[in-house]
């Protein structure tokens, strides 16, 4: 079911080259995929979902500003969270789309909710896949899981530190930095924080050297977002104001969308639906790819 050809093109969006893929008939209902990370790219989503979705939808996927295959952000230019929203809005105009739906994975779910709160009339429906709406809550949950995994692999000292952080009153910024530092201690086991099933994405479309360049760009993107700090604002209070139909998809084994965030969504979403993917961790789009595609098509039709 996979794409191993580069199907994207470069589009000039608000003074920057963005990598954009489109799949399916433009007459189909349009949906924009927003990747997580920050800085993850749409590569794995395209690899697993482009073929599955393109018969029913018009799927647009991007590497966000400064990420992976998109043009890098330079030191002397202004960049912040809001640029990600404005890029979406501009891309929509360039593609001559009046309204589109959004799939937001992980941090992409955060961006999607922010987008809907700023430009509600641009958006039809929203699918959140393992989203975060609150960086502090997500970092706490991730630190807790990291602590348990570190313990499992015999790293007692850092495990204790991780668990202590998760229940401390540290700021959202401090929690994120602690998580980045402590999860790195898991080394090659780090993806166990996220995956229930192994990620079978074939990355051979690009060379190791190319992936390294992409990864460096993405790091700048993430660092600049952290420096700006706007992403540390909780968006949980915005859920109640969204009129759009929303679907929350969470993998049973994922902690990114922690209980408190799920509870708030279920309580506050006016037009919200919640589905658990029993076999998935953080990425149902590849852990249960067929079910994910069917769910998306059914919800957006």
Where are these regions (language model features)?
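Conserved hydrolase catalytic core segment
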Residues: 98-142
